Every structure is written in structure tokens, then in C-alpha cells.
Swiss-Prot record:
Belongs to the ClpA/ClpB family. Residues 8-171 form the Clp R domain. It comes from the Eukaryota. Induction: Up-regulated by strigolactone treatment. Residues 12-80 are annotated as: Repeat 1. Keywords: Repeat, Transcription, Transcription regulation. It holds the Pfam family NBD_SMAX1. Residues 99-171 are annotated as: Repeat 2. Interacts probably with TPL/TPR in an EAR-motif dependent manner. This is Protein SMAX1-LIKE 3. PANTHER family: CHAPERONE PROTEIN CLPD, CHLOROPLASTIC, PROTEIN SMAX1-LIKE 3. A motif (EAR) lies at residues 778-782.
Length: 815
């Protein structure tokens, strides 16, 4: 298609024709004989408020990424051949460069898309259909040369095209809604009762207090929220919501107030919220697009003092409400927001993002489709996930679930992921009007079997990691090394099991030969027939579990939830941490400021460690808690998990007291203890498994003074290297974990703290710990606290106390 550029205007709208004219001018200035899709794409990208640039910014939020894309297009244009006549050389050229074949094909694709997408256009002849800018952009992005340039700059053409299509659909929806007659008093899309009930059910769920409702049309979402408010006013809701008060805020008319005005309004809001603490408050923020746009234009909202921003101040104060810092643990507070999918994607961007600051979870509601349902959305993608069948199967399998709360959350997440992946595979190839019949006739046996396999898998993982003390009947961690069954294996039998690499698993196959069966439980010892072939990932902790690709990808998705909170050392983060921790342990408030500084310093990357002579940034935090106030230690650890990682589910405690003792024992007890230490998982191995399962959390290691010598050495190496190694030689990175080593004090050098060289290896029954001396002599001239400090430092021969980032002495609680 070699037609001149002036003849193209007949097939384009005014805006699209203007873009093509600018592209022709660009080609003429560069001396190019033809206008290509590269010229058009470069022209559209140069417009600061253009649709293509906006879509690219949504795909990559960093503005320098778009600058890199512009440079890549510039390089691609420089590679195009120039004609003999060039205005840069003073040689005249043709007044209108011709349209290249690639651009002509793009026009045809856009015209075809335009014709298919409009009923009015289908009734017109092909030459009468005018191409709009949106369809031109989508067609240009399909061009191979444009896709190649975008790929070089780190962009994905299909992803950017999706953003453009979403923007077009939102614009159509808003135009249709605004053109509806107000006197009719009805929305274009009727509010479905099932959507309203799902929002109410979400409000009843205690685990999902802060959420944003996402949909393609804000009018539909707003209609659902108004219906919920009407039901609350009529008391047509569950008992827990009957006295709840709605507070709706409108920020669109907020303007640019001063700092005093903002603080006054926030104080009024806080007072209003506190006045309803007994009844409950639902704070409706409305459309979150105002916050997103205001943060993007942050520089224009700054006052004369460059260190203060109105929007950031409001966001942080609302975050305190969302995190429960104002109403406390007993307050009933919900945070609700509305957003289109386009807006919510931008809520997930920024450092830190609105999603992380407000602990937002997501609900999505379709604009028109009656086949979709309001359902939970993953934090990584805005997809509708149908989890009704999974919940039913979980209820049917409730008698088989015996794992802890932490593993239960991961199990449910993996089950929903498995269900959604199966449903996507079975329905993607069918038209919408056939999918409901496919679902009715779908055989559910496969899903049921998959759920049962997940139950077995997570029961095994939880038993091997979090419920190790429950294996006392297997002699692996029992202080008395006794079986409750009728027969007791000999020492040589247990030693044989240990040397052959036994694993405690939940075994359902009754035809295993190499197993020791406990009569009262279904736990068995399974000896792999081929050790080299039975190795699995450390996160499984079970060589008999079946890990397929879907399960592995689900575990990877779990690891992606590592929070990016509190990654900067600034006054705002420090104040937030201090306020939250002091509210939990006011009697230990003297320790809080230094503790918060330690966490922020480590997480911001300010601290470094030397590895092989090189300085390496560290993000993991190591703290040593000493003292008798066990309650304060755990409260601080749990609050750090809630603040930094978003939930108290990100807290795990490893306690040695279940399988360690430092008291004087008989010869038989000492022999059994040595056998137990050799055959059970050591303290450092339990820690390494916890890190491998999920490093992005707070790990409280209790009774560290009772840990064996090798475990203490392992902890010190983990502090120095940022990685922890298990007995198999596999390493796991600590990433940004917060590790708290806790003890009352290092009182005396017990057998557990002594190096292995001090222990006898001849197997004699003499109690070698009988005449153990204390680390220091008692000096009556020293105070009790000073004596404890000196005693602890002298007992720490390994240097663990000096290796951690900070040490904190907890004074006894006054209560």
C-alpha cells in the first residue's frame, strides 16, 4: 500500500488522523521515505498524557522505564534507511512520505477490530468505518517491529495492550453510566443480591477487616455498597453488624489544605471512630483513585516545607486506623475502598504501596456477567476465583485436618490455587453460554482426590516441622526414650534407622516393609529404599510427599508475599513502630526506641556483613532478648510480625523446652538424652526448616541458652553469612527475616552448652555432668544485674551475643 499520507484521513477519526500526521512529520524530518508503525508508536509515546504512555506506566511504574522505551524507539528509527533527499542535508524530499505495507496492514487490522466491536459499524460499508485512536494503538502494538522494540526495553506488548483495552472498556462503561437518565433512579447494571451478601459475609469475617472492592464499573460497585448500607440501616444483617456505623469520606473535593487543617480533620475522624468503638465503624473511603493520582502528583501537593506532604500524612494516619493502632485489639473497625482494576494495579505500586500500608485484601465484582460471582482475589493478580467447591471439600475433609493454623492457611491457599487452575483449563476453550453446562456436567472426582492428596501432604509437613514434640512415642524426641506400645526397639535398631536416613511421615500404605509401627497412632518410620532418589525440596520435609508442578508453583506464590514494609529508615516508620510496640508492652517502653531503630536499620540495608572479604548488604535482623519477661518478648515478636509482614500468622516460635533439659539426671537418662540428640532433629535444623518454609516472617527462638554446642555454632554462622545450612548441606537464605534469640540468662555452662569434645564418646554410664563448674564465681560486690551480664558474657565462648545486631535486657514485669 503505497498511497500518499493525505488519502489516509478518510479512514481515521480526527484524533487518529492527527497522530498519523505527526508521525508523517517525524518521518519527513528524519528523511525516511515511508511512515512505519515505529513512527506512529514513537509519536504516541511522546505524548505525556497519551493512552499508550499511560498504559506503559501502568505496566512499569518506574518513569525511567518509559524513558528507556523512548530511547529504544529512537535507536530503531535511526536504523531505518533514509532517502536520497534529506532535509537535514538541504536536499528537498517528497512533501508526504508514503505509508509502508506494515502500517497499512495495521490500519486494516484496526478497521476490522473497529467493525467487529460495534454494532453500528457492522451495518456500514468497510470504507465508512473510521479508525479510533484506541484501536490504532492496539493494532500498532501487534506489529512485530514494535513488539521487538518494546521487548528490548523490558515491556510486554500483550500486557500493554491489555491495559489499553481495560482503559477503553472503563471509558465506555463511564460514558454509558453518565448517559443514563437520572429520573429513572436505577443503575444501568442492577445490583445482585448475591454480590451484596458476599460483601456482608466479608465484613463478618474477622480475618478480612480491610478490603477494597474492585470492578470494571464504579457505578456498579457503588450501588453494591449503598445496598449494603441500606441493609445495615434496616438491621437486615447478621447480629455482629446491626449496630455498625458507616463513615463515608469524600476526598475528591479536599483541595490542598494546610497541615493544620489536615491534622484537625484527622483528629475529628479519630474522635468519631473512638466514639463508636463499642458498636463498630466501617470507614468507606470511596474511590481510591484520588489517593493514587495524588501520590503520583506528589510534588505538586507539597507545601512550602518540602519534608511534608498532605497525601502521605493522610495515608499514614489512615494506615494507623487500619492496623488497629487507634482502637486497639478490642476495637471493631473496617476499612473499605472502591477501585477499578486499573486503579488497584496502581495501588499495588509505590514504596510502600497503599496495599501494604493499609493491609488491604481484595474483592472483585463483575460489571455485567451473570455467570461470575464476587470472590476473593489473590494479591498477585486480579482474577475471579471460584472457591465454593473447595470450601465444601475442605469442610468434608475437616476430620482429616490436624495441622496448625499456619499450615492451614497455606493449605487453603494451595487448594484454591489448584481449583482455580483446573477450572481455567476446563472452561477457557468454551464460549460463555456453554461454560455453565460444562460446569454442571464436570466430574468432581479429580478435584476431590487432589484435595485429599493436599491433606496428606500438609499433615506430613506440619507433623515434621511444627509438631515435632508430638513424636515422643517414636523415641525421637522423648526425654525418656520410651515406647507406649507393647514392644520397644533396641538401641541398635534405632541407630540403624538413623544411619539409613529415616523420616517421620504419615503413611497410609499398609504394605511397607521397613517400618516400625506404633499401635495407638498411624505414624510410622519410613526408610527410603534409595536415599539418592528420595531427596526433595527442604520445604516439604517429607520424601514420601508427591510434589507436582502445580504444588511447586503454589509454594512459589506463597513466597512472593514477602512484604516490602519498613524498608526505609525515616521518622515516620520509626514513630509507627514505636507507637505500636509501646501500646503492647508499655512497661518495657524504654527498650522500644532502640529496638525499632535496629529493625529499620537492618531492613533498610544500612547494615553490612563481610563475606569472603567483601562487604555485602544485609536485610535480615538478629536480636537477642534476655530477661524473665517472657510475655513481653512474645508480644513484641507478634506485633513485629503484624506490622512488618502484615499478619500475626507470619510469627513462628521455636522452643527447645519440649526436648531439652539441663537438670542433673541419672545415667539412664543421660544415655537416652545422648541418643535423642543424635537421632532427632537438632535445634538448628528445626530453625533451618522454618526458614526454608518461609523466611519472610518473625522467628522467635526460645531457650537458646539450652541449645547444644553445634546448634549455637550454627546460629552464629547464620548471623555471619545470612544463610542457614541443615544437616543435608542444603542452604536457605534468610532474606529479610527477623530472628529473635531469647533466653532468661546464661546461668552456667551446662552439658547442652558445652562443646562436643567435652562429652565422652566411649558410651560409659558415668554421669559426666556431675562436677560441672559455673562460668564465674559469685561476687557479692556486684549488683545482681551486673553479675548476670558478666556471667552471660563469660559463658558465651562462641561469641553469639556479640554477633547479633542488638541485645535487649527485659526487666521483670511490674504486674
Amino acid at each position: 500500500m503505497r498511497a500518499g499520507g493525505c488519502t489516509v484521513e478518510q479512514a481515521l477519526t480526527a484524533d487518529a488522523a492527527n497522530v498519523v500526521k505527526q508521525a508523517m512529520g517525524l518521518a519527513r524530518r528524519r528523511g525516511h521515505a515511508q511512515v512505519t508503525p515505529l513512527h506512529v508508536a514513537s509519536t504516541m509515546l511522546s505524548a505525556p498524557t497519551g493512552l499508550l504512555r499511560t498504559a506503559c506506566l501502568q505496566s512499569h511504574t518506574h518513569p525511567l522505564q518509559c524513558r528507556a522505551l523512548e530511547l529504544c524507539f529512537n535507536v530503531a528509527l535511526n536504523r531505518l534507511p533514509t532517502s536520497t533527499g534529506s532535509p537535514m542535508l538541504g536536499v528537498p524530499t517528497s512533501p508526504f512520505p508514503s505509508i509502508s505495507n506494515a502500517l497499512g496492514a495495521a490500519f486494516k487490522r484496526a478497521q476490522a477490530h473497529q467493525r467487529r466491536g460495534s454494532i453500528e459499524s457492522q451495518q456500514q460499508p468497510i470504507l465508512a468505518v473510521k479508525i479510533e485512536v484506541e484501536q490504532l494503538i492496539i493494532s500498532i502494538l501487534d506489529d512485530p517491529s514494535v513488539s521487538r522494540v518494546m521487548r528490548e526495553a523490558g515491556f510486554s506488548s500483550p500486557q500493554v495492550k491489555t491495559k489499553v483495552e481495560q482503559a477503553v472498556s472503563l471509558e465506555i462503561c463511564s460514558k454509558t453510566t453518565s448517559s443514563s437518565k437520572p429520573k429513572e433512579g436505577k443503575l444501568l447494571t442492577p445490583v445482585r443480591n448475591e454480590d451484596v451478601m458476599n460483601v456482608i459475609n466479608n465484613l463478618v469475617d474477622k480475618k478480612r477487616r480491610n478490603f477494597v472492592i474492585v470492578g470494571e464499573c464504579l457505578a456498579t460497585i457503588d450501588g453494591v455498597v449503598k445496598t449494603v448500607m441500606e441493609k445495615v440501616d434496616k438491621k437486615d444483617v447478621p447480629e455482629v453488624l446491626k449496630d455498625v456505623k458507616f463513615i463515608t469520606l469524600s476526598f475528591s473535593s479536599f483541595g490542598q489544605p494546610s497541615r493544620a487543617d489536615v491534622e484537625r480533620k484527622l483528629e475529628e475522624l479519630e474522635t468519631l471512630v473512638k466514639s463508636c468503638v463499642g458498636k463498630g465503624v466501617i470507614l468507606n473511603l470511596g474511590d481510591l483513585n484520588w489517593f493514587v493520582e495524588s501520590r503520583t502528583r506528589g510534588s505538586s501537593l507539597y507545601n512550602n516545607n518540602d519534608s511534608y506532604c498532605v497525601v502521605e500524612h493522610m495515608i499514614m494516619e489512615i494506615g494507623k486506623l487500619a492496623c488497629g493502632l487507634v482502637m486497639g485489639d478490642h476495637g471493631r473497625f473496617w476499612l473499605m475502598g472502591l477501585a477499578t482494576s486499573q486503579t488497584y494495579v496502581r495501588c499495588k505500586s509505590g514504596q510502600p504501596s497503599l496495599e501494604s500500608l493499609w493491609c488491604l485484601t481484595t474483592l472483585t465484582i463483575p460489571a455485567t456477567s451473570n455467570s461470575l460471582r464476587l470472590s476473593l482475589v489473590s494479591e498477585s493478580e486480579l482474577e475471579v476465583k471460584k472457591s465454593e467447591n473447595v470450601s465444601l471439600q475442605l469442610q468434608q475433609s475437616s476430620d482429616q485436618l490436624s495441622f496448625c493454623e499456619e499450615c492451614s492457611v497455606k493449605f487453603e491457599s494451595e487448594a484454591r490455587f489448584l481449583k482455580s487452575s483446573n477450572s481455567n483449563v476446563t472452561t477457557v476453550a468454551l464460549p460463555a453460554w456453554l461454560q455453565q453446562y460444562k460446569k454442571e456436567n464436570q466430574n468432581s472426582h479429580t478435584d476431590s482426590d487432589s484435595i485429599k492428596e493436599l491433606v496428606v501432604k500438609w499433615n506430613s509437613i506440619c507433623d515434621s516441622i511444627h509438631k515435632r514434640p508430638s513424636l515422643k512415642t517414636l523415641t525421637l524426641s522423648s526425654p525418656t526414650s520410651s515406647f507406649s506400645g507393647s514392644t520397644q526397639p533396641s538401641i541398635s535398631t534405632l541407630h540403624h534407622l538413623q544411619t539409613n536416613g529415616d523420616w517421620p511421615v504419615i503413611e497410609t500404605n499398609t504394605h511397607r516393609h521397613h517400618s516400625v509401627v506404633h499401635e495407638t497412632s498411624h505414624l510410622r518410620l519410613f526408610i527410603p529404599e534409595h536415599d539418592s532418589e528420595q531427596k526433595t525440596e527442604l520445604v516439604c520435609s517429607n520424601p514420601n510427599s508427591t510434589m507436582n508442578s502445580e504444588a511447586s508453583s503454589s509454594d512459589a506464590m506463597e513466597l512472593e508475599h514477602a512484604s516490602s514494609r519498613f524498608k526505609e529508615m525515616n521518622a515516620e516508620n520509626l514513630a509507627t513502630l514505636c507507637a505500636a510496640l509501646e501500646s503492647k508492652v508499655p512497661w518495657q517502653k524504654d527498650l522500644v526506641p532502640e529496638l525499632a531503630k535496629t529493625v529499620l536499620k537492618c531492613r533498610s540495608g544500612s547494615s553490612t556483613r563481610k563475606i569472603n572479604g567483601n562487604e555485602d548488604k544485609k536485610e535480615d535482623t538478629w536480636m537477642f532478648f534476655q530477661g524473665l519477661d517472657v510475655d513481653a518478648k512474645e508480644k513484641i515478636a507478634r506485633e513485629l510480625a503484624k506490622l512488618v509482614f502484615g499478619s500475626q500468622d507470619s510469627f513462628v516460635s521455636i522452643c527447645l523446652s519440649s526436648f531439652s533439659s539441663t537438670r542433673s539426671d541419672s545415667a539412664e537418662d543421660l544415655r537416652n538424652k545422648r541418643l535423642r540428640d543424635e537421632q532427632s532433629l537438632s535445634y538448628i535444623e528445626r530453625f533451618s526448616e522454618a526458614v526454608s518454609l518461609d523466611p519472610n516472617r518473625v522467628i522467635l527462638v526460645e531457650d537458646i541458652e539450652q541449645a547444644d554446642y553445634l546448634s549455637q555454632v550454627g546460629f552464629k554462622r547464620a548471623v555471619e553469612r545470612g544463610r542457614v545450612c541443615n544437616s543435608s548441606g542444603e542452604e536457605a537464605s534468610l532474606k529479610d527475616a527477623i530472628v529473635i534469640l531469647s533466653c532468661e540468662r546464661f546461668r552456667s555452662r551446662s552439658r547442652a552448652c558445652s562443646p562436643p569434645s567435652n562429652q565422652k564418646s566411649d558410651g560409659s554410664d558415668q554421669p559426666e555432668d556431675k562436677n560441672v563448674a559455673t562460668c564465674v564465681a559469685l561476687d557479692l560486690n556486684l549488683s545482681i544485674d551486673s553479675a548476670y551480664v558478666c556471667e552471660e558474657e563469660s559463658c558465651d565462648e562462641i561469641g553469639l551475643l556479640e554477633a547479633v545486631d542488638a541485645r535487649f535486657h527485659f526487666k521483670c514485669s511490674s504486674t
